[in-house]
């Protein structure tokens, strides 16, 4: 024990230095100064000698002894400045922090005098106790003296009390030297415990831990402890579940160290110590914690272990680090232990469990956020695969990764099922990797709980959606069909309306004509009536005159009766009187013809008049037939009916009376008929036969044309037409190629090469041969004589070695020798007589693909059997069919059918089909007609619908108006200002006008304008549904297709009309093609009308939007609209993406600011617990840390997303850093970026670095 005055110098000097005063400045020792000195000595001795009890314990008795203390009276005599000095020394000795000292300093000077007086009285009472505490150096000496067992335990208990009760200055005196002694003893006890375990060893270890706790209950002690090399490791080694109380204290101390604000990463130092201890003991580093959490241990130990786990995980800033630690604990069995801990009813346990769960959930959401960042930054398949491959390469995970890929190859290659497989696999992988509570799954457990019910429900819903989409597609097709039918009906209705209007016009014209004729007839009638009246008057006058003449004649006749009788024969007869039956009155002029060419009946003739019949034609009773055209088939005139010598006159018209011939004039005789010709029978002989009649043999048919049809049978009773006499017919030309031309003379004395005919076809060398014209007189090939090497054995070897057939030839058997071999019948290679080898080969290949008898192929063509005939079959048949001349030549070889090659046999059979090639072309057109209609009709409907949609779309019109408004505003003051409209093609050029910052175009501006102010305009792409289809329609090709269809229909119709009469009952060509032509013509007329309507609408659209339809084709116009439609939709998406990016940048900036603010708050909260950098020696630090750990205040903080991170472990940091960099570049003013956020690598850089490390 030191004397009371011995510590004046050091203690006083220390405090004087802290307050900026030297010892010389203190009052002198004489007079009152002696009393003052005694007071200061008491303060100093108090710091050296302390009782074992706490200073506060003496405060209870201070009031009772205060009046008896002579020091109080002496304290009243010193100045206020000296009181303040003593007061500051008292505050320092009381181990109060600055926050608690400030209210005391604000007290009045009187209160401060009382406080100092009470404190001095308390210190005096402690000094008067019989037992005074030992000094720090004495403890150090005792610890170094090698105490063991009970003596060591007693010393450690006394040391613990001293460390708890003495001020910080005492702890500082104990300092690093005393701490080293404690750690040496603790290490020795740990090492000895592994060999032998004494009764006091565990108690001594626990007591040392308690001493360390007391030593670290201030900043000096914590700093000193952290400066040691093995201090944390020894605390970790003290976590022994066999000594629960010691493990509890050790775990609490380690937990407090983990949450210290300075130095950083204290949790990592504790983890390193735990790892080193695990390597020493050859166990898992978290195994002691798991052992302490298991059942059978105390609740306090479980709380302490879980508290240390939270302290290890929570301070870490890196997401990967937290997930890694948590997953390692789960793999050791923490998952099962947690279920037991949740059943414990303890408040401290609930606090720690709550902290663990909250931190795990937050990490889970952070991990999901990292997945979003990966999706944004790493979207290249090859790059992602390469990174994963380099990650697992040459590791234990490599075969498992390969197995995963191999299993993926087994996914069923089904269009519908494959996406469902991958969705299920993705969900499983997501739940495995992004496991709840931010941990890895329990790999020891065979049963892994994966929630796929929700995914299956989604798949079921997706299947329903897909079915609905399929149904919608089907309905869309039906809608297109209905639209097509509607357009067809519209065209038909328009045609009917036009026809009706035309008929109305025709009827109105006829009515007008009839009215005009009626008026003319009425006028004529009036004229005739007037004329009749006039003539009646004249007749009456003439009748009167006649009567007068008769009377006069009668009177004269009475006078000259005799002379009149004698000369009556010479007097000419009087002219017939009016009204006599023999009077012939010329008929009135015929009336004008009625509309339609109908001649109205003439007015009736007066009674007794007659019209003589027209004279017969000269020569004749019969009209000779017209002469036959040259080259046409001779068709004899029909024979006369039996018993009829001449053509009878036509019968009278119905209702008409026969007009008798006029009677002969009085006194005239009938005109006799003309006498017959000499030797005639009264009927003129028929004219001589014209050229081409029966007697002259017909000319041979044209090449490729059909033969002459047989003559019709004779009428009954008429003689048959004799066949042409022999020799009168024109012989057919000789077959092609059968002429034997003279052999050309070869140059240089060359002779024609011998033509070989091997028994079987050999493999042919593919050389480039020289002909005689390629050679020169001095070249090698003009002198060769290869014939000298010719022999049968050589040819047999060639046949054996290079035969194109696979079967063993007879030549091989002949070569092997053997006189008793049997002759093998070989199929002769039939020579081609008409066709060339290439044509015959192609035809044989074609016929081999059908495997049908030739006659059946012929019958199918004759019957036009569409069930067998296909488009490709007819096309190949037309392509491979021999020419008509060749078919004609083959038809003449019918007698040699069996000796012909197969291809020529087919030609013989097909040559009997009349007009084969036109027939095949017509059949091909019939098979293709429906496809042509289905190709043309949708194109017409698309253009028609697109024209109608453009005219009816109000939203598109609004967009054009907005564009016109914006354009006129932007062109203000230029030559383009004040426009009334613009060309539609300008819409595609909107994106060429860019903004001042080059970040958007005029098109983007219009799209954003529509989004914000006119959202209904955004619907115009849906209203122009047929513009895309119309953009693929070429009006020129459409017109050509219609013209081609019209021409083909006309050709087929002409072929049907000119087709000869069928000679085979199976020939249904004319019958089927006639009905087809009729239907095809109707379909064509409908298409033509639809096309005409389309052109009309497009022309009207040109007038509507002011463009020339002749210069701007349908395809170009709708292609511009289609491109603009796509560009507008793309601009809308880009605007949305740009807004999302700006929003992300804004949120990222806010998140960064918030995270930085929370980091500072966290730092402040930690510093509130303990400020390691502040001046002064604050006590009770460890108690505050342990209290914060126990209540959860050290963990609970408002923590935003961990995207803002100083480390590179969090993927989102890269996105925020890049976005903030862009945002800062765009900001008008400078923005200070914290240095901690600089240099943060992006996730792509991390991946590339990982690839580099792996490779």
Curated annotation (Swiss-Prot):
It holds the Pfam family Drf_GBD. It is found in: Cell membrane; Cell projection, Ruffle membrane; Cytoplasm, Cytoskeleton; Cytoplasm, Cytoskeleton, Microtubule organizing center, Centrosome. The modification Phosphoserine is found at residues 22, 1237. The modification Phosphothreonine is found at residue 751. The modification N6-acetyllysine is found at residues 1040, 1086. Keywords: Acetylation, Actin-binding, Cell membrane, Cell projection, Coiled coil, Cytoplasm, Cytoskeleton, Hearing, Membrane, Nucleus, Phosphoprotein, Repeat. One of its GO terms (biological process) is regulation of cell shape. GO terms for molecular function: actin binding; identical protein binding; profilin binding; small GTPase binding; transmembrane transporter binding. Residues 1-12 have a biased composition (Gly residues). One of its GO terms (cellular component) is spindle. PROSITE patterns: DAD (PS51231), FH2 (PS51444), GBD_FH3 (PS51232). Residues 1-73, 567-737 are annotated as: Disordered. The modification Phosphotyrosine is found at residue 1104. Residues 460-562, 1027-1179 form a coiled coil. Residues 585-736 have a biased composition (Pro residues). InterPro entries: ARM-like, ARM-type_fold, DAD_dom, DIA_GBD_sf, Drf_DAD, FH2_Formin, FH2_Formin_sf, FH3_dom. The modification N-acetylmethionine is found at residue 1. Disruption phenotype: Knockout mice show normal organization of the cerebral cortex with no significant differences in cortical white matter or callosal thickness. Histological analysis of coronal brain sections at early and postnatal stages shows unilateral ventricular enlargement. Homodimer. Interacts with the GTP-bound form of RHOA. Interacts with RHOC, PFY1, MAPRE1, BAIAP2 and APC. Interacts with APC; acts as a scaffold protein for MAPRE1 and APC to stabilize microtubules and promote cell migration. Interacts with SCAI. Interacts with DCAF7, via FH2 domain. Interacts with NCDN. Interacts with OSBPL10, OSBPL2, VIM, TUBB and DYN1. Actin nucleation and elongation factor required for the assembly of F-actin structures, such as actin cables and stress fibers. Binds to the barbed end of the actin filament and slows down actin polymerization and depolymerization. Required for cytokinesis, and transcriptional activation of the serum response factor. DFR proteins couple Rho and Src tyrosine kinase during signaling and the regulation of actin dynamics. Functions as a scaffold protein for MAPRE1 and APC to stabilize microtubules and promote cell migration. Has neurite outgrowth promoting activity. The DAD domain regulates activation via by an autoinhibitory interaction with the GBD/FH3 domain. This autoinhibition is released upon competitive binding of an activated GTPase. The release of DAD allows the FH2 domain to then nucleate and elongate nonbranched actin filaments. This is Protein diaphanous homolog 1. It comes from Mus musculus (Mouse).
